[in-house]
Curated annotation (Swiss-Prot):
It is a multi-pass membrane protein. The keyword Transmembrane helix applies. This is Olfactory receptor 5P1. Keywords: Cell membrane, Disulfide bond, G-protein coupled receptor, Glycoprotein, Membrane, Olfaction, Receptor, Sensory transduction, Transducer, Transmembrane, Transmembrane helix. PROSITE patterns: G_PROTEIN_RECEP_F1_1 (PS00237), G_PROTEIN_RECEP_F1_2 (PS50262). It is found in: Cell membrane. The keyword NAD does not apply. Residues 47-54, 121-133, 218-237, 293-310 are cytoplasmic. Disulfide bonds join 97-189. The chain crosses the membrane at residues 26-46, 55-75, 100-120, 134-154, 197-217, 238-258, 272-292. Pfam families: 7tm_4. Potential odorant receptor. It comes from Mus musculus. Signal peptide: none annotated. The gene is Or5p1.
């Protein structure tokens, strides 16, 4: 299709999850509730880590940054999705759509790197406890956190750069609830044979590298745990890892489905459902996953609650 024969697109229309008026009301209330829980849960984690002395450790520092990333991730998508339930077929200027994609990819990629850093932290704590203060010094922790955000920005610029190189001169209705790369690619009147592959290679490379770090870390952790003679020691070591493993499984399972698997292997409806899970649901679940099974967090929350009401 030749761009010169069509009017250039100035805004995109998000079709959202549904056009049924009754479902729109139900979804609005439901997802507004999820968003509020997401904000309250993650802000609580950040405040607890900053205010409680017993949580001033690398593990909880990473957890506080994960909470911040989850807030950014959810906020990049949910408010616009909620508007879509009130005003059907939400219109977004092209630059706003590009900015949303950039934000989603930045926070999503940063989460990958933070989860890998948290796995390495658990590896050092369990396999080399005597060297923990050296290997996980404040400088190294800040370096890992900084690298996570930089990695997120670099990957986001890969996606955004590819999007900026495309021309849109025909249909402008995105069959999605946010400006994801794959639905936008379908609307382009440019040759997408190469542009469509680059983001998948970039995202796939990050997933492979971070999964490798997580896998190797947990292989060594498992070997170390199996060598422990104390049943109590094994239980304690396992309990410090189960929350992280749960978060990793949920998150990587969904993003691998979207960004690595061939687009022909799933439908647009499946894409929306899985995208909804990793952009909206998982940011709400993470604070619950890490707090419900963590004695330190529960104790810090109890003390903070007592301080408020005393």
């Amino acid at each position: 299709m030749e761009p010169g024969n069509h009017t250039a697109v100035t805004k995109f229309i998000l079709l959202g999850l549904t056009d049924d008026p009754t479902l729109c009301v139900i979804f609005f209330v439901f997802f507004l509730g999820i968003y509020i829980v997401t904000l309250v849960g993650n802000i609580s984690i950040i405040n607890l880590v900053r205010s409680c002395p017993q949580l001033q450790t690398p593990m909880y520092m990473f957890l506080s940054h994960l909470a911040f990333v989850d807030i950014g991730y959810s906020t990049s998508v949910t408010p616009i999705m909620l508007i879509g339930f009130i005003v059907h077929e939400t219109g977004l200027p092209v630059h706003a759509c590009e900015a949303q994609l950039c934000s989603v990819v930045t926070f999503g990629t940063a989460e990958c790197f933070l989860l890998a850093a948290m796995a390495y932290d658990r590896y050092v704590a369990i396999c080399s406890p005597l060297l923990y203060s050296t290997h996980m010094s404040s400088q190294i922790c800040l370096l890992l956190v900084g690298a996570s955000y930089v990695g997120g920005c670099v990957n986001a610029w890969t996606f955004t750069g590819c999007l900026l190189s495309l021309s849109f001169c025909g249909p402008n209705k995105i069959d999605h609830f946010f400006c994801d790369f794959s639905p936008l690619l379908k609307l382009s009147c440019s040759d997408v044979s190469i542009i469509g592959i680059i983001p998948s290679i970039s995202a796939g490379s990050i997933i492979v590298v971070t999964v490798f770090v997580i896998s190797v870390s947990y292989i060594y952790i498992l070997i170390t745990i199996l060598k422990m003679r104390s049943t109590e020691g094994r239980h304690k070591a396992f309990s410090t890892c189960t929350s992280h493993l749960t978060a990793v499984t949920l998150y990587y399972g969904t993003i691998t489905f979207i960004y690595v698997m061939p687009k022909s292997s799933y439908s647009t409806k499946q894409n929306r459902v899985v995208s909804l899970f990793y952009t909206v649901v998982i940011p709400m679940l993470n604070p619950l996953i890490y707090s419900l099974r963590n004695r330190d967090v529960k104790e810090a929350l109890r003390k903070a609650t007592l301080r408020i009401y005393s």
